[in-house]
Amino acid sequence: MGSKITDKKRKSRDSESESDDELANGLFDGILSQSEDEEDYLPSDDDDDVEDSENEGTGASEDDDDDDDDDDILSDDIPSDVDSEEAINRLVKQQEELEITEPGVDPKREEDDGADRNYRIEKDANGGERYVYDEIDPVYDSDDSDAKGPVNTIGDIPLSFYDSYPHIGYDINGKKIMRPATGDALQSLLDSIEVPKGWTGLTDVDTGNPLNLTQDELELVRRVQMGLLPTDLQDPYPDTVEYFTSIEEKMPLSSAPEPKRRFLPSKNEAKQIMKLVRAIREGRILPYKPPEEREREEEEQEEVHFDLWQNEEPQAPNPMHIPAPKLAPPGYDLSYNPPEEYLPSKEEREEWENADPEDREKEYLPQKHNALRKVPAWGNLVKERFERCMDLYLAPRIRKNRLNIDPNSLLPKLPSPSELKPFPTVAQTIFRGHEGRVRSVSVDPTGVALATGGDDGTVRVWELLTGRQVWSVKLNSEEPVNAVRWRPTKDAFVLAAAAGEDIFLMVPTHASVTPALDQASRDILATGFGYATNGQQPAAPVSKEPAAKWARPGTKLEDEGVLIRITVRSTVKVINWHRRGDHFATVSPTGQRSSVAIHTLSKHLTQIPFRKLSGLAQTAAFHPLRPLFFVATQRTIRCYDLQKLELVKVVQPGAKWISSFDIHPGGDNLIVGSYDKRLLWHDLDLSNRPYKTMRFHGQAIRQVRYHRGGLPLFADASDDGSLQIFHGKVPNDQLENPTIVPVKMLKGHKVVSKLGVLDIDWHPREPWCVSAGADGTARLWM
């Protein structure tokens, strides 16, 4: 029997090991329900006894089989026949109970749960089992779906009283509410980085736990921030119900009798009529008279004439008469009852009396009297009057003529604006089509097409004179187009646009673009790819990140005319071309060291010329004649020589924040616009300081631009929604100063979100300018 039991236990152990392997492999994951109690699966005392006996039996059998050659075995280690028979009886009894009960049902569990069951089993009409559930007791604890946790019931007592205790208060049952555990500094840092849903950063003063918002509370906050109603159950715009017009009422709304005031004379009107009657009787109100009778009465009245100058006496003119100067008004010390601080002390009185009359500061001493009637006569009155007459007689007096100068005469004489024509005066064409702000405009070198870029991520090309849109492409659906600039030469029709961190080079299709011009433009853009494949581009170190990536934008954009995409490290805000069209500069104000980049079109090469800038770069431009490069930071403009690679000049406009600048086509003058509402003219040969500062706007100046076609015009664009046109003539003689005359202020753009006119550009030949506004329009001024 011992060996049989041992074999059975070994088989059971093998089966248990196999089941353990299957659970480890995840074959039975999730079979047990979470609602089952863990106590039902704990081993009972009987099972422990069986297992102990089995273990003892198994150990004995193994010792008998394996240790045949060992020493004698103690009698206590050998199992007795009685113990083995009792163990066998228990196993047989348990096996019978398992066979009787249904599989998966624990009889002990049913007996234990019988007292807690909320139902009873009855027989139905067919003899089957029917479950009858108890009535639900509608007490407060029965519905605990919205029940809150333990509430701190300490009342209006500060939690600082419990700082020295491990608990923070008591719940409604009088049990202690323990203080919540707090993490270390690392855990606090991780909690601040990984913010859970509904996190507010606040702590509940009652419990000390973090105070989080539920999903309903977050939805309520979101709706309040968006200006919506707190719930969706209310209709903010219900349909109007016409109660008195839509339904024909057959019965009167009110059957009250007619009020008495409808058929009785008004007492108030009777009082007003009596006032008029009394005024007529007293003659204060005259009856109406015809105009003829009124004129006849006026003619009958005699007119009284008298001489104003009847008693006037002639006086001899005395132009040399000068009135005497007035005496100084008396002070507080001349009062009959002066303040105490004006009265002299005993020492001061003795000092004044002992001094000579010529050495005294005053000819009198202040005295105090209780009443004005007690003031005696002034003994020095005759002496003072005599000395005053002597001063008027002997002291020379002259008449001084004041200079009455007209302030306008001090201003320089400027020519009349009518003599300085032509310049733009009216809005000729309005270009509408962008959604949101129009951030940049540019007129092509031929003066036929206009390119615009806006917040909707599109670039649009228009006919300048007609305002008709001829071409458009969407570059980015998330980022706005911050800058658009045409290539300055006429041998190609190439447009550069910046959207986010990408710069796109494209060839728009237009009626004025011939097939030869279109092919020449595409060849110029495709030259760089061949250059890169020939290996002529200098090899960059492998460890360094390239300054920019030149690639094709994709089939969709290539079909629309976009041929090259240049990806840089940060958002591009400014694009400016070199006069020859092979180089262009981009500025990314947030790019730090790589904020300014120079791109070579023929080589597909991008260079970062500066290792470090003393400030945030705002804009950059090439000199129109010489190999100079200008970079503007927030307060200064630096001029670099590209051949010698050195700093040439630092221009200091004195502005708080420079927004834009432009170089005169002659190359010797510079205009600067700033966010502090100032327009500054610099003469580069004269000084680093501004030659003239002009303040004509009430808001920030966004853009300034010279006319490139030889006309002495320049303009600025401001956030107040206006453009100021100036006549700026630069003489050929170095001894003469430039002539700057404001000639016209153009208004038409609307101010949206405190933004007005964002960009401006001139026609290459005509005195026309184009502006871009935050109201979503571009305007042609002629």
Swiss-Prot record:
The keyword Repeat applies. Residues 1-123, 339-361 are annotated as: Disordered. WD repeats lie at residues 433-472, 476-516, 567-609, 612-650, 653-692, 696-736, 752-782. Residues 105-123 have a biased composition (Basic and acidic residues). InterPro entries: BOP1/Erb1 (IPR028598), BOP1_N_dom (IPR012953), WD40/YVTN_repeat-like_dom_sf (IPR015943), WD40_repeat_CS (IPR019775), WD40_repeat_dom_sf (IPR036322), WD40_rpt (IPR001680). Pfam families: BOP1NT, WD40. GO terms for cellular component: nucleoplasm; PeBoW complex; preribosome, large subunit precursor. One of its GO terms (biological process) is maturation of 5.8S rRNA from tricistronic rRNA transcript (SSU-rRNA, 5.8S rRNA, LSU-rRNA). Residues 35-86 have a biased composition (Acidic residues). Keywords: Nucleus, Repeat, Ribosome biogenesis, rRNA processing, WD repeat. Its main location: nucleus. SUPFAM superfamilies: WD40 repeat-like. HAMAP family: BOP1. Component of the NOP7 complex, which is required for maturation of the 25S and 5.8S ribosomal RNAs and formation of the 60S ribosome. This is Ribosome biogenesis protein ERB1. It comes from Chaetomium globosum (strain ATCC 6205 / CBS 148.51 / DSM 1962 / NBRC 6347 / NRRL 1970). The lineage of its organism: Eukaryota, Fungi, Dikarya, Ascomycota, Pezizomycotina.
